[in-house]
Swiss-Prot record:
It is found in: Secreted. The keyword Phosphoprotein applies. This is Cystatin-C. Residues 1-26 form the signal peptide. The gene is CST3. GO terms for cellular component: cytoplasm; extracellular space; Golgi apparatus; plasma membrane; vesicle. It comes from Macaca mulatta. Transmembrane segments: none annotated. A motif (Secondary area of contact) lies at residues 81-85.
Amino acid sequence: MAGPLRAPLLLLAILAVALAVSPAAGASPGKPPRLVGGPMDASVEEEGVRRALDFAVSEYNKASNDMYHSRALQVVRARKQIVAGVNYFLDVELGRTTCTKTQPNLDNCPFHEQPHLKRKAFCSFQIYTVPWQGTMTLSKSTCQDA
């Protein structure tokens, strides 16, 4: 009698294992499954995200011909991807400050309020970092006036 039950039990066991290892196994209802090694949402409060943001804004200011510094008004979206290091993908709204590029401290610079000097940009940055080597690179940067 054990023979006839063996095949269905074997099929049931194979099905259970296949479901357990499938990418959809850990998915929440209504959300697509997260891929291992794929980009995932990150908090702006994470130290790595903050460092990547500071680096990207610094590089933006270096490349800009504007006499004023810009700084982040709002981080619209932050994602990270673990590779042979970490890729950060940041969508950021930047605002022009009253501080000129000759002023070293950007943290306390207020944003311009005068209409003819006020300027905003929306930027998408990709930053690659290898924290244990202390390296950070701006891989991609696209900005448009907001």
